[in-house]
Amino acid sequence: MEDLYGILGVDHDASVDEIRRAYRRLARELHPDINPDSADRFKAVTHAYNILSDPEQRQRYDRHVSGGFSSDFNLSDLFQSFFDTSAEFQRGSDLLVNIDIDLKTAIYGGSQVVKIDSLVVCDVCNGTRSEPGYKAEVCFDCNGSGVVRGEVRTTLGNLITQNTCSKCRGNGERIDHPCRRCYGNGSRSAPRDITINIPPGVETGMRIKIPNMGNAGGAMPGDLYVDCKVKEHPYFLRDGQDLYCRLDISLVDALLGTKVKIDSLDGELAVVIPALSQNRDVIRIANKGAVTLRGGKGDLCIVLNVLLMQKLDPEHRALLKKIMPNPPKPKLAKRTSGFFSWLKNKFT
């Protein structure tokens, strides 16, 4: 178990002022907006300070340390009871941004840069909120703890409550000379370019969470949430795991068959068109469809669109009659439903 005094770098008999000075120094050094790799250490320092700066909590901690912990004692439960009230107000607010993603990126993944306006740590006061050359003073109302404690009588007994200090808004400091750049807020609005890593299989309506990329706060920054919308593709349509496209072919190629190359989302692809292909026949190519978030991959379904000749000269007419001297007579066909109707709605 880590020693809370050791986390702050103070002796076990350190005064409240010594503990407060140690915390302020470490907080400025380890703040996630200044040193992103030290987020865990910053959290530990904040936890240690919140316990040791409060006489009752410090006495309780010292008593457990000196007396030893029982086998079923959970230090995280002790921490949780101390920090549920005070940690949240120190965290920055979350941000939400909407992005449009092309179909290829949505299927195979990629990255996209978006510009957002968010609160960042002030580059003049480095988040101290005071004008350079001045220091913050301890808040008189909460004695620097950031919370005001009270006692409520209930039928179950007296309950100790903790509320964010309204005077310092939970910062524990009194700012007599506020920074002129950020007006004493410790942060300011600024544009930022954020690279969004898009996983394969994203669909419209999905939300991506990027931790600690939201607004700056007194401690941890908020999170950035990205709502995705997949743009329509001019040639390809996604339906579940499968991709659909329509391929125009001539009557000759439909009758005799051929081999063509198409530009799919996955690169150039050779497609064999069988002889005697009918209009709206579907050629299914396995594992060339859409990728899902779970890692599966669908098929590429190519719907054939046979193009009839728009004009026939006498020579062509005579040749067709010679090839097909007795064609079948026109007759009513039974109505079909299901897959054929679905394709018709998609591609007509």
UniProtKB/Swiss-Prot annotation:
Alphabetical list of InterPro entries matching this protein: DnaJ (IPR012724), DnaJ_C (IPR002939), DnaJ_domain (IPR001623), DnaJ_domain_CS (IPR018253), HSP40/DnaJ_pept-bd (IPR008971), HSP_DnaJ_Cys-rich_dom (IPR001305), HSP_DnaJ_Cys-rich_dom_sf (IPR036410), J_dom_sf (IPR036869)
Keywords: Chaperone, Cytoplasm, DNA replication, Metal-binding, Repeat, Stress response, Zinc, Zinc-finger
Source organism superkingdom: Bacteria
Binding site residues for Zn(2+) 2: C139, C142, C165, C168
Biological-process GO terms, alphabetical: chaperone cofactor-dependent protein refolding; DNA replication; protein refolding; response to heat
Subcellular location: Cytoplasm
Binding-site residues, Zn(2+) 1: C122, C125, C179, C182
GO molecular function annotations of the record: ATP binding; heat shock protein binding; unfolded protein binding; zinc ion binding
Record comment regarding domains: The J domain is necessary and sufficient to stimulate DnaK ATPase activity. Zinc center 1 plays an important role in the autonomous, DnaK-independent chaperone activity of DnaJ. Zinc center 2 is essential for interaction with DnaK and for DnaJ activity.
UniProt function note: Participates actively in the response to hyperosmotic and heat shock by preventing the aggregation of stress-denatured proteins and by disaggregating proteins, also in an autonomous, DnaK-independent fashion. Unfolded proteins bind initially to DnaJ; upon interaction with the DnaJ-bound protein, DnaK hydrolyzes its bound ATP, resulting in the formation of a stable complex. GrpE releases ADP from DnaK; ATP binding to DnaK triggers the release of the substrate protein, thus completing the reaction cycle.
Protein family membership: Belongs to the DnaJ family.
Protein name (Swiss-Prot/TrEMBL): Chaperone protein DnaJ
Gene from which the chain derives: dnaJ
